[in-house]
Amino acid sequence: YRDGFCQAEKAEAEKLGVDVYNLLNEKAAQVPAGSYGTICCFRDVMNYIHWTHASPTFTNFELDPERFNKYTFYRAILENTALLVRGHIELVKDATGNEPDELVFAGGASKSPLWAQILADVCHKRVRVPQVKEATALGSAILAGYGVGLYPSIAEGAHRVVKWEQTF
């Protein structure tokens, strides 16, 4: 989406020396929850029995550039993704009877407070963002520490090393 529709924002971000997603999130935060009714369907909840995939679509928008613009569509993408996470949590709960009490939002997407808040609102769960966003590298370091005896358990290693930046 960024590369296909947000060239002006990419140029502005480069000029300002900021991440383009900061600009997109700032504008999308001004769009009300529900994106004025715009429905994004870029993905669908996994169907493991009949492997299907939704065709990417936007529906229920009007030709009104004040309300229905690239920031509305961007927010609708974030909302769609949050709904997918909720759907997958429900699938796991239906299959196992268990669901997480909270979600950890790591990686590049965790740099978006807007997306983390949307995820918390849609899933009705606390979303925690770690200080170290690259969870794979941090997890590898924790496992290495456990492997050489630095930590008595993996859980203890995680408890000592993982620090939380923000909770939504």
Where are the language model's segments positioned?
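Short acidic (Asp/Glu) and glycine-rich catalytic loops that position anionic groups and cofactors
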Residues: 2-7, 56, 118-123, 159-165
